[in-house]
Amino acid sequence: MCGIICYTGKKKVIPILMDGLKRLEYRGYDSAGLAVVENGKTFMVKSKGKVSSLEAKLSDLSSEATFGIAHTRWATHGKPSEINAHPQFGCNNKVSVVHNGIIENYLEIKEELIEKGHEFTSDTDTEVIAHLIEQNFNGDLETAVLKSIEKLDGAFGIAAIHSDVDHKIVVVKRGSPIIIGIGENEYFAASDSTALAPYTNQMIYLSDDEMAVLNSTDYYIKNLSNEILKKKVEFVDSDMYTNDKKGFEHFMLKEIFEQPETIENAFRGRIIESEGVSKLGGLEPVIDRLKNMKKLIIISCGTSYYSGLIGRYIFEELTELNVETEVASEFRYRKLKLDKNVAVLAISQSGETADTLAALKEAKRKGALLLGIVNGVGTSIPQLTDAGVYNHAGPEIGVASTKIYTSQLVILTLIALLIGRYQGMSFTEGKEIINAIKKLPDQIREILSNAKMIKEIALKYSVYNDFLYIGRLFNFPTAMEGALKLKEISYIHAEGYAAGEMKHGPISLIDENFPTVAIATDDLVLEKILSNMEEIKARDGKILAITNEGEKKVKNIADDIIAVPRTLPLLQPILNVIPLQLFAYYIADEKGCDIDKPRNLAKSVTVE
C-alpha cells in the first residue's frame, strides 16, 4: 500500500529519497514526506498529494544531510493530509518513523501514552510507534525499537531514526515487505526492490520478525530475540526493474504493449515440445505430492482472482482435480476441510497481498500443500509457500494490472498441463496446447496492431456512464476483468456478469444508454451468448462484441465488433482481454483520468 525508502551513507540523501519515492509512488500517492538528520537536527517535510507536491516544497531547501527516511502514503488510519503524512514523530521531534501496515491495538497504546504525558497531533496509528520508541529510548535506538514492537499487534514494516543517533536506521518487518540494499559504504531499505535497483543489485529480503540495523559503514540483521542472523544476499537483475515509459504516454499502455514479451517470458524454458509437457523447476520439489492431489483451491484478490477463476476452468479441462477458487479475504474465515491432500495455490502480482498471505498461513496451519504464482521475487508469498512459479514479467507500475494477468493465465495453463500429463492427458493433446501457447505472442501483436481502430471504438463509447460486460465459461471471468479495468481507471460504472444470469436481473437496466460488451468468441456456448445478445438488441441496447474474425452471426447482431485471432477455448481469454484493456485505457485517457494512479487505489495491497 505505502512505500518506504531509507538511506544512510556519504551521498546527499534527499535526491536519493525523492527518486525512491517516485519509483514507489504506484504503491500509494495521497501524501508523501521525508525526514533527514543534519548536524544532530531533524528536518521533516511533508505534503498532501502526489510526490510532485513534496518535490515542489523541497525546491528551496538546501541540505547536506546524508541519511534519512521517506514515505509515500495510501491512507488507512486518518484522512490524507499533511499532518497524517509520514514520517510521524514523537513529542521532542527526535524520533521519526515511517510505517506500512496496520497497528490493530494502537488506540489502547495511545491511551497509555497519553496518560504518561504524550501529546498526539495526527489521526494515524503510525504516530503511536514514534511516541512508543521515544518513551523507550535510553540512548540506544535499536533497543528502543525492539522494546516498542513487543507491544504492537498487527502487520507492519517500520523504519525509525533518531537525531541523537548519527547515521543509524532501524527497520523491522512483520507482514509487510522490507528489503535491504547493500552498496559500497552505503545502505538502503525499501518496501520494494524497484526503489533500490538504480543504486545496487545486492539485496536482502527480510522475513517476518526480523530487524535490520543500518549505518554508513556496515549493517547487521537479527531476530526479535536479539540473535544475529546470516541472511543470503540476492543478486538482482537491475534491468528488470527499470522505471521507464519508453515513449508511451502511460505505464499502463506500455505494459499492455509488453504482453507479447511477458507471455514469452512466462513459457520460455518451461515447455518440452517433444514430450508435449511443461517443465516447471519451481514445482519439482513437490511434484510427487502434486500429481496425486485430489483437490486444488486457488486463492487470490482483485484481477488475480479473475485469473484464478479462469484457472479453475483450465484445471477442470486438463486435469482430474476438484478445483475451487476463493477470494482470499473470505477464505480464511470459512470452515473448509484442509489437509495434506489439498493444495492451495496463491496468485499475487506483488507477492505481498495481505489477505492472500493471511489465507496461506491459515492453510499452512491445517497442513495443506502451499503453492504460489507471483511476480515479486524474494517476497513474502514465495518465502511462505512450499513451491511456486515466478512470472518474470518485470515491474508492473500501472496500478491496473494488465501484463501480469495474462502471464498468470499462461502459467496456470502450464501447471495444469504438467499435472494433466501425469493424470492421463495424451501426448497429442499436450502438444496441441503447447503449439497454441507458442502462437500467443504473435497473436497478441496482431491485436495490438489494431490499437488505432480500438481507440476509435473506445472514443465512440466514452460518452456512456454505465456498461454491462457478459461472457460464458472461460469468458465469464474475462467479462468481470474487463469491467474491473473500466471501473478502475475511468471511474465509469461497469458490471461483469455470466451471460446466462442477465435475465435474472441485469437486463432490467438495458436501454439505449446502457451498452453491453459481449465476449462472443468461438466455443461451445457461442450460440447461447448470441441469444443473450438478441435479448439486448430487443431492448434497444447497444452491443460491442469481442469475437473471432469471420463470425458473421455476431457481426449481424452487434453494433461494433473487435476481432481477435482464434486459439484453443482455454487460451482464448488471453487474447480476448487485450482489446478490453485497450478499450478501458482509451476511454480513461479521453476522460483525462490519472490512468497510472487511479484515485483511492494502490498497487500492492499490504493491509487486510
What annotation goes with each model-predicted range?
Residues K291-K439, I519-D560, F583, K591:
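Glycine-rich phosphate-binding loops that contact phosphosugars or nucleotide phosphates
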Residues T66, A70-I83, E273-I287, G311-I347, ...:
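Glycine-rich oxoanion-binding loops at beta->alpha junctions
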Residues M1-E249, E264-K294, Y333, R445-N450, ...:
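Conserved short alpha-helical segments that host acidic/polar catalytic motifs at enzyme active sites
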Residues L152-E186, S462-E488, D523, L530:
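Acidic/histidine-rich
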Residues Q259-I263, F267-I297, A387-P515, A588-E608:
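Active-site phosphate/pyrophosphate-binding segments
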Residues M252, K542, K555-I557, T567-E608:
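Generic C-terminus detector
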Residues F67, V95, K295-I297, A343, ...:
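Structural motif
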